[in-house]
Amino acid sequence: MKSLIFGYGQTGKSFENYLKNKNLSFDIYDDDKSKLPGVHQEKDITPSFNNLKDYQDIYISPGVKLENYLTKKEISNLNLKSDLDIFFLEHNSFKIGITGTNGKSTLAYLLEQALNHSSSAIALGNIGNPVLENLNHQNKYSVIEVSSYQLDKMENNLFDLSIITNIEPDHIKFHGTFQKYKEAKLKICRDHIKTIFCEGHDYENIATRIAQDLEPNSSYENLIFSLLPHRLEEFSGRFIDDSKSTNSSSLRHALSKLKFSGVLIMCGDPDKECLSEINIKGPNRVYIFGKHREDLVKIVKHQNIKDFATLDEVLDDLKNLNDSSKILFSP
């Protein structure tokens, strides 16, 4: 019997490579047919239960919300597989899962460095390195950044160690409520898995302490960390790139940490967090751009706001500034 890959983003493509390597037959479905390889564009697959029930396995991408297509009972009668569940069964490394609303990418990046200082590790998952593309890696540790979307699809929790950086409202549009978002996040500590709940934002210290616990016979005195790209990264003297920021709590942290008083550039969909108001304190100007700019202008509270259709328009306007204010890009 054939299998189906449901969703053709980065994870969907890793499913494709995985199934090809096993010489298994499969179809691919995505709401956007233009993304699919040519042979799969020709197939007319409607995501109804009658069409899906005949597939042996359905490899489900994290961002797919099956409830938009099927009832809960219908979903329960399908054989769903996530990339995490496959990796748990097919790789024998020590698996560290890291999740949280903010800081998970930073901590995964730093913990990978700390463990490579004393042993061998690779950062995988939501950090941009799909787990299924790394089934053959030989490192002792897999440091896996996982989103609420991925945890929502995970059937069995087989992490050896779980870490939660923090939980604040986010992705409410996908999960429906903050409570359901929290429940998805907390799946990472289900089944009596040892879990670390982080306190504060000193992720270099947290990463070092975790590495010391795992590799107690190693010294970390000479460890020098490199920082995660696009996370409060300064360049050209006045620009600060915080484009890894994806929610309002991350923005608040950046403004607080920097004690920022320059120009803030922001964009995004406020419905993602069900936001009704964003108070911006510190910057002397706020530039808002993108397709959701009108929605953001309504809820951002600041005395000096300008909105633009595109980032290019923002950059053109910045050329007219007569001062040397720092510019924070935190979309």
In which residue ranges do the predicted regions lie?
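Short, basic phosphate-binding NTP loop
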Residues: 1-97, 229-231, 298-300, 308-319
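Short beta-strand "acidic-cap" motif of Rossmann-like dinucleotide-binding folds
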Residues: 26-30, 122-123, 143
